[in-house]
């Protein structure tokens, strides 16, 4: 009886250790894939943006990371489809950012 209980506990412990190892391996693989994807993304952005434009994007990323991620995704998609012929300058990036920003509502308060 004690041997069966000890055997059962040992098997359960081995199963838990195996599951934990599998989850760690899976997490490591996911992180590796994420890093590779980020490296590819940065390589494409280096190819299609001038240094000034990249600097502008990185400074905007500090305050609006979601917005910059959206712009980067659009730029990468355009580059992969062949619609970007030369490097995007800072001025061109400013125009793209201005177009992509949602329109702000002008709220005026009148006193009566």
Curated annotation (Swiss-Prot):
In the record, the note on similarity to other proteins reads: Belongs to the PDCD5 family.
Tell me, what is one Gene Ontology molecular-function annotation carried by this entry? DNA binding
Q: Tell me what this protein is called.
A: DNA-binding protein Mthe_1571
- What InterPro entries would the database entry show? DNA_bind_arc, PDCD5-like, PDCD5-like_sf
Phylogenetic lineage: Archaea, Methanobacteriati, Methanobacteriota, Stenosarchaea group, Methanomicrobia
Pfam families in alphabetical order:
dsDNA_bind
GO terms under cellular component = cytosol
The entry's keywords: DNA-binding
């Amino acid at each position: 009886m004690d041997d069966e209980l000890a055997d059962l506990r040992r098997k359960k412990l081995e199963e838990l250790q195996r599951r934990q190892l599998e989850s760690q391996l899976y997490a490591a693989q996911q992180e590796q894939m994420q890093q590779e994807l980020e490296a590819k993304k940065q390589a494409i952005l280096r190819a299609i943006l001038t240094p000034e434009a990249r600097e502008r994007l990185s400074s905007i990323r500090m305050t609006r990371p979601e917005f910059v991620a959206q712009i980067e995704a659009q730029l990468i998609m355009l580059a992969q489809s062949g619609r970007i012929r030369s490097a995007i300058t800072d001025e061109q990036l400013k125009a793209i950012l201005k177009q992509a920003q949602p329109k702000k509502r002008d709220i005026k308060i009148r006193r009566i």
